[in-house]
Amino acid sequence: MIRSPSDVPVRPDTAAGAVRPPRRWLPTGLVALVMSVTVLGGFVVAGTLPAPDVSPIALGGVLTIRPLPGWEVVRRESATVPSPSGTVISGEFAQLTRGSGALDLLALPGVGGTALELADLYAAEVLTSQLERISVSELVERIVLRNGREAVRFSYIGSEPRTGAAIEGSVTVVVAPSGNGAVFDGWAFQGQLQLIGGELVAMIESAEVA
């Protein structure tokens, strides 16, 4: 179980992110993780090209996020996550991609509890079912997003079952006062997580959880 010590500093700038093979949804409907990697391209002089207007994405009346220019929705579907009591929690899953990178989003209406409890559920029921040799950090960071919403963030490392590739990731979890929850899962092949950290943090920081 992941836990949150009182001496963990508040850091609203921690990164997330990377790329993994096509997502596998479990037959039971377990929400899947997919991940993200930034593709490094050429250089453009600041101000030369206007930034395109990107429309916000809304999930389940719970989560609203504005993709950065170049990111687009490539997958969107209903998802369920098993709860410790044996029931299932229904929500909506979406995947944003940019080149070979991706950011997974999970919106869970009325999940209740705390962000730490939802983070523990996600680690136990989703991450462990999708990765082999998974290792999740015992300590989580309590952070405050730019909009003032409190959240928790933890890291993990594991291997992709089909290829054995080492993967590292960072998960940010928010539960609003309404009881609605949101999970932002960013990942990359080991050693590449930092490449997309800035863009992932920017999108998460500007997201709204109703």
PLM feature segments, named:
Residues 1-97, 187-210:
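N-terminal targeting sequences that direct proteins away from the cytosol to non-cytosolic compartments
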Residues 3, 12-21, 25, 49, ...:
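Conserved polar/disulfide-associated segments of primarily extracytoplasmic proteins
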